[in-house]
Amino acid sequence: MSRFFANGSESESESSEEEIQATNFNKASAFQFSDDEEEVKRVVRSTKEKRYENLTSIIKTIRNHKKIKDIPNTLSSFEDLTRAYQKALPVISKEENGITPRFYIRCLAELEDFINEVWEDREGRKNLSKNNSKSLGTLRQKVRKYIKDFEDDLSRFREAPDQESEAEDEVVALESDGGDAGDDSDAGVKPTEAAPKAVKSAPAKAAPADDDDSDDSIDWDSDSESETESSDDENQYQNMRERFLKRTTEKEEKDDDKRKDKRKEQKTKIRKRAEDDEDGEWETVVKGHVVEKPKMFEKDAEIDVPLVLAKLLEIMSARGKKRTDRRLQIDLLFELRDISDQHNLGTAVSVKIHFNIISAIYDYNQKISEPMKLEHWALLLEVMQSMMKLLLANADIIMSESVAEEHEEYATSPFYVRGCPLAAVERLDDEFVKLLKECDPHSNDYVSRLKDEVNVVKTIELVLQYFERSGTNNERCRIYLRKIEHLYYKFDPEVLKKKRGELPATTSTSVDVMDKLCKFIYAKDDTDRIRTRAILAHIYHHAMHDNWFQARDLVLMSHLQDNIDAADPATRILYNRMMANLGLCAFRQGNVKDAHHCLVDLMVTGKPKELLAQGLLPQRQHERSAEQEKIEKQRQMPFHMHINLELLECVYLVSAMLLEIPYIAAHEFDARRRMISKTFYQQLRSSERQSLVGPPESMREHVVAAAKAMRCGNWQACANFIVNKKMNTKVWDLFYESDRVREMLTKFIKEESLRTYLFTYSNVYTSISIPSLAQMYELPVPKVHSIISKMIINEELMASLDDPSETVGMHRSEPSRLQALAMQFVDKVTNLVDVNEKVFDMKQGNFFQRGNMGNRGDRGYNRNQNNQGGNWLGQRRDRNNRNRNQRGHHKNNQDRQQQQQQQVQTIDEE
């Protein structure tokens, strides 16, 4: 029997229902339904219900995947969720006034928390499979990018995550039912507007409490029904559409009642929890037996210095043991400090407790390679500064690691406390660097951590003041080096203003501070490492502020390049950074050759990123082990200290272009021509091998295109490739006073293009006008005259200057292109003949033939034959040498004749 319609009246008795079924059976038999139609329940749902049900099913799938940490499927489900939400947007805009449903925001928040939890679990991440690890990175990026549009909703949700909307109640009920197929289809998220309607219509549809009628019979309207029933139907169904809609059965209504009861219980619990929170704070009970916090002192104990020190020794004796609660240890030390301050036990005792708190915070993190927690970092900064302020305020407290524990004095002045604030601040500085390395350099977290550098430098300054008052030279050198390492890479614009006279000479700049600190280390340090690092930092700081000559002199006088190979890796990294910055300084000052020499060792290896400790290149198989990679990552520099690698490479390639292109033009036919820059030469050759070259896009392509233009002497095209909007944005605008650098570059391009032009086309001209060259290259006539004179003096250009006519006369002493190629061909043929002769000698040998080994009488004959005609190889070599000498003699005669002709012309002119 078809169950297409449910019974409309639940108040009828069983007997009347059977009569109606009997009377209606014959009429209903006229309608024949297929078996498929009999098994299907007709459900009419709105678009909002469909969209919301799709969203909730995907959210449930995501939660299941999260429980088993199935990250690839979580990623695919998240992509499905975003697509489903995009489809539901029109419905949300229409029904919810554009407000994102709370259950969707809850899903995003839970997903973000799940990703952060998995990402922070380093040990767990290492054990992930390759597919899971890759999917985790992709999912993290996509979620972080996606939730940017929901930041306000997420922040509001996180402020009150326990509040639930009506739509979210449906989701909770759906998940609490156990996940039936029927429940999934009927218990989806319903529209918020439909919920009140369902509540209002419930009394009309609800049956009495003792009504147990079945809902499985078919209610067909017949003529035999009473008028009361028909009138009830008319009141119950306002239109024909409602008459044929699915009606809820008793079982479904019971399920709905259960869900409503559960929701009421949940809301009641939340309300009670909020009321309890208003009464007072609650503590989370840890699973297992509760460990009572140990009492500090007895109730009636007299608290004095020996008792506090004994308690301090008792707390610190558990340091480093296996089952020590390190968090509890820190709390006890803070409590002991408060007790000491309350009973006025003296500043020395307080300093001692402060130092032990610092040690306990350092001990909290057992893995030295990992950074400490942010809460401990903030606590450490606060305690460290508090301790140093106490030491500076009380000059009679002497804190040193040379003080033995039995010689500590807390009763009478001067007070002696065992401890080393220098070691504490050095560890503090190292922890700060670890925190920076751990953060994503492009996130706000990195900026937040970088703001802590102010407090770190302030703490170092406090320690520096303390050791300047009472400290050894070695301790002062160590703390000076820490301050130098926070100062040397920072640019101070006041230095250049002071150079230009815009500031008074008495103004103290960072260069003056560096001079003071470094000179003390040069004079007082007895360890090579501190002095070497101070020199390197000093050179770096000078180079950053364009003090080229001071930086160069320091490099030459210190002989660092001779001893740097024996230094530790951190010092070698600092040396590489210094050379890179020195090369940039030389380039800014117009010393192109020096800039190239400084950068060539870094760039020729192809690994400047690794040499400057700014990242690791993808490794080949078994190139380095996991332990080596871990050590190298620890040596990396923080992101804010990086040198722009693209800027470095551009400066190197431009310097190489300005040196290499004129050299190539001058030695075009020289077979033994050497390469000034191997990297630039390879870039040039690879570009020439390409059959089709498009317009330049990258920085390297711009430099190569400029080099090709310079080879033709076209300085304008060369300058346009080097100095343009794209290159300015990528490279030149990164320089301080970038306009001056661009002007300097254009000037050098003009001069080197002129030199290249003269080298390339000197065999074409008999004479050339200097004013014409000056006009062509937009250079002053004296500058052109100076360039040509220098080329003639260095014997690079065979020409003579005629000052009255302002012309350059070419001597044409160099061979033409055909002659140069012919001479190269002759040299190569001669080399080939020599090689063949050597091979022939090796095959024949210089011993007598095997057939005449026993005939001693023939030895004289063979010797005579060798002397007469057998030595034809030697004769041929002699003949070649004579021909060579004759050619050289002929050339000398030609040179002599040309000189004589010039002398005759000079005499005639006089």
From Swiss-Prot:
Q: Where is the PCI domain?
A: 639-815
Does the record's keyword annotation contain rRNA processing? no
Which residue windows does the record flag with biased composition (Low complexity)?
A: 193-207, 862-874, 895-910
GO molecular function terms attached to this record: RNA binding; translation initiation factor activity; translation initiation factor binding
Could you list this entry's UniProt keywords, alphabetically sorted.
Answer: Cytoplasm, Initiation factor, Phosphoprotein, Protein biosynthesis
- List the residue ranges of the region (Disordered): 1-21, 157-281, 847-910
The Basic residues compositionally biased stretches are 882-891
The record's section on PROSITE patterns has: PCI
Its primary localisation, in coarse terms, equals cytoplasm
SUPFAM superfamilies associated with the record:
Winged helix' DNA-binding domain (SSF46785)
- Cite a single Pfam family from the UniProt record: eIF-3c_N
Under InterPro entries, the record lists: EIF3C (IPR027516), EIF3C_N_dom (IPR008905), PCI_dom (IPR000717), WH_DNA-bd_sf (IPR036390)
Q: What does the UniProt entry say about where the protein is found?
A: Cytoplasm
The entry sums up its family as follows: Belongs to the eIF-3 subunit C family.
Q: What is the role of the protein in this entry?
A: Component of the eukaryotic translation initiation factor 3 (eIF-3) complex, which is involved in protein synthesis of a specialized repertoire of mRNAs and, together with other initiation factors, stimulates binding of mRNA and methionyl-tRNAi to the 40S ribosome. The eIF-3 complex specifically targets and initiates translation of a subset of mRNAs involved in cell proliferation.
The molecule here is called Eukaryotic translation initiation factor 3 subunit C
